[in-house]
Amino acid sequence: MIVTDKISDVRNIIKEQKLSGKKIGLVPTMGYLHEGHLSLVRIAKKHSDFVAVSIFVNPIQFGPNEDFDRYPRDLERDLKLLEKEGCDLVFAPSVEEMYPSELLTTVNVDKITEKLCGAFRPGHFKGVTTVVAKLFNIFTPDIAVFGQKDAQQVAVIKKMVEDLNFPVEIIKAPIVRESDGLAMSSRNVYLNPEERKAALILSKSLKEAEKLLLNGERNANTIIKKVNEVLNSEPLCKVQYVSCVHPDTLEDLTYIKDKALIAIACFIGTTRLIDNLLWGENI
């Protein structure tokens, strides 16, 4: 496994691999890897011949009062995990390497970034699309794998790729959960034992939504109401939003015809957690 913090190294390595006919797979991460991230690496391995992982806590996607400084980091541990998975290349740049001078060019996807998480984290998705566009230009991957837990991020990146003709296929990977149902997240480390228990309310509320859907309920408001009810039954849970949208366009749904995404964001104590249920689409 090659590890580098230099863009020029990545370019040379990828060029070599492409010349020998290899298909390049990219898994962009912010590090502090968990089983969810590792599942993305496994999916990338299935769809490509050379798997690259980027580890970069991207400052421009954090708001002024968000957790950039305390976001968990452990590169040594991450590298051990990736080595075990048979990853080929790890790119772990410094902020200076990625943003050597004042950043005057950004990539912004309109409209679908203004709802769900975007409504509460202004500028967040602009930071995401800008860094992902940079990574796509650095790696020129054939495929890139993103987790369904960040459902809005996947939709936004897919739109950017479509609109700007990036020659990369975006593969969506299913949410990986702890044995008790909590969606895996690097931010789960912030939860104390009491909050960790309370956080199960997110997946419980989505289970209730799924039950309604399986029983034939198609009215989005009925489902949203039920999810809110379950979430509000947990005193430590402060709901930020519950939405029922189309998974590709993120348009609000009133009636569920085929595909739907039930997306939620809550604070458990001071930790913001997101989760979702994808209905009518197999990934």
UniProtKB/Swiss-Prot annotation:
The keyword Nucleotide-binding applies. Its EC number is 6.3.2.1. One of its GO terms (cellular component) is cytosol. It is found in: Cytoplasm. It holds the Pfam family Pantoate_ligase. The keyword Cytoplasm applies. Keywords: ATP-binding, Cytoplasm, Ligase, Nucleotide-binding, Pantothenate biosynthesis. Pathway: Cofactor biosynthesis; (R)-pantothenate biosynthesis; (R)-pantothenate from (R)-pantoate and beta-alanine: step 1/1. (R)-pantoate binds at Q61, Q153. InterPro entries: Cyt_trans-like, Pantoate_ligase, Pantoate_ligase_C, Rossmann-like_a/b/a_fold. The active site is at H37 (proton donor). One of its GO terms (biological process) is pantothenate biosynthetic process. Belongs to the pantothenate synthetase family. Homodimer. Catalyzes the condensation of pantoate with beta-alanine in an ATP-dependent reaction via a pantoyl-adenylate intermediate. The reaction proceeds by a bi uni uni bi ping pong mechanism. This is Pantothenate synthetase. The gene is panC.
